[in-house]
């Protein structure tokens, strides 16, 4: 981690955009936790959107539950952006008083591609990619499919962590869309084979000024860490059990499942009391 910080400036003050690519059970969330552990004292606030939180209770161990959501809704991201605008203004004003306010925050979108058409085309998502660093917002996006991010947004990614992938088609997609610094696809596959065993990862650093391959590509393995907590202590003071918006939503009732404009169901009672 120290080498990546030194060589690639993975620093909370730089508010990097980080993408983690890997199929299920390759350690994406574990890697995100490892990265956050290394900057645990840097962020007073944050936002987590993870569809599996109600099942695995992963992020609530180190992020206040009030900051975690398991259903992507554009309004949540928009409100977070507004929060960062206000924090940035407060920071600029606080410098004059000598009591500097810390505006930094993190945002995690954990496997949100179930709502891909919704979030990737949403204006607030594009704003985070294009301008998040200007609002002191570090963003970590985990995803299983390499093309989950459109080309115009990929150019704003600072770090790409590539985890184990044995499907040749997906390897080629990763190579063509994220790893063009490798002279050949075969060389890229050799690096992947060497760097992604045992939950290790291949790291591509896009914000270096060098064109040398050794300055842009690294190996990294996430570590297990003792319990820790992110965010300002005031956010933990009244921390309560996580409430799932996904489980509370009544999306599976008969009315919502009925096809649009379909005629209502009609029950016909037959002689003898049966239904047809």
Residue ranges and their predicted role:
Residues 56-58, 213:
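Short acidic, gly/pro-rich beta-turn/loop elements at beta-sheet edges
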Residues 4-8, 15-44, 51-55, 74-186:
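Conserved P-loop NTPase motor cores
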Residues 10, 49, 66-68:
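Intrinsically disordered, low-complexity eukaryotic regions enriched in glycine, serine
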Residues 172-210:
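P-loop/Walker A phosphate-binding loop and immediately adjacent motor/lid segment at beta-alpha junctions
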Residues 63-65, 157, 177-179, 191, ...:
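General N-terminal targeting signals
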Residues 1-18, 197-276:
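Conserved P-loop NTPase motor module
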Residues 60-73:
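Active-site regions of enzymes building and remodeling cell-envelope glycoconjugates
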Residues 59-62, 153, 194:
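Short, conserved catalytic or adaptor-binding loops enriched in Gly and charged residues
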């Amino acid at each position: 981690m120290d080498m990546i910080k030194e060589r690639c400036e993975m620093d909370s003050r730089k508010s990097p955009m980080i993408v983690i690519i890997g199929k299920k059970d390759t350690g994406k969330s574990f890697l995100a936790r490892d990265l956050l552990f290394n900057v645990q004292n840097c962020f007073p606030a944050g936002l987590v959107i993870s569809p599996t939180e109600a099942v695995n209770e992963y992020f609530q161990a180190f992020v206040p539950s009030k900051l975690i959501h398991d259903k992507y809704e554009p309004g949540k991201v928009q409100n977070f952006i507004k929060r960062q605008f206000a924090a940035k203004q407060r920071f600029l004003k606080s410098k004059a008083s000598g009591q500097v306010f810390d505006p930094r925050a993190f945002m995690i979108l954990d496997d949100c591609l179930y709502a891909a058409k919704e979030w990737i085309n949403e204006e607030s998502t594009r704003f985070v990619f294009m301008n998040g660093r200007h609002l002191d917002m570090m963003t970590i996006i985990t995803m299983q499919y390499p093309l989950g991010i459109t080309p115009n947004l990929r150019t704003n990614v600072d770090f790409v962590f590539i985890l184990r992938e044995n499907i040749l088609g997906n390897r080629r997609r990763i190579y063509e869309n994220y790893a063009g610094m490798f002279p050949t696809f075969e060389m890229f596959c050799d690096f992947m084979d060497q760097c992604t065993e045992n939950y290790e990862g291949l790291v591509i650093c896009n914000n270096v000024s060098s064109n040398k391959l050794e300055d842009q590509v690294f190996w990294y393995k996430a570590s297990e860490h003792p319990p820790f907590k992110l965010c300002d202590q005031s956010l933990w003071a009244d921390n309560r059990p996580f409430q799932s918006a996904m489980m509370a939503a009544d999306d599976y009732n008969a009315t919502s499942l009925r096809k649009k404009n379909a005629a209502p169901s009609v029950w016909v009672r037959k002689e003898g009391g049966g239904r047809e």
